[in-house]
């Protein structure tokens, strides 16, 4: 199991950054991850787009994999939807800016 703490940075106003949100990593590879989260728009900043859906927002995250040191990643969200479980949560897919060596072999997070 892996936990992630992430913030969302506005693409329109980069000085505007959300408060940290804790989520659960569902899938993880060197190129990206999917995250289950209770909030899709922390502090009113949507994980994917600004309010007009014209400018991409950015996500900065720290991934905590049990037994390993924390790993910082940055990137953009490429998809999102409501999650099936737990009820009332969301899931999003994040593409990293740079491949992450620590996750090169992927991880079994089940």
Where do the model's predicted regions map?
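Structured alpha-helical
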Residues: 1-110
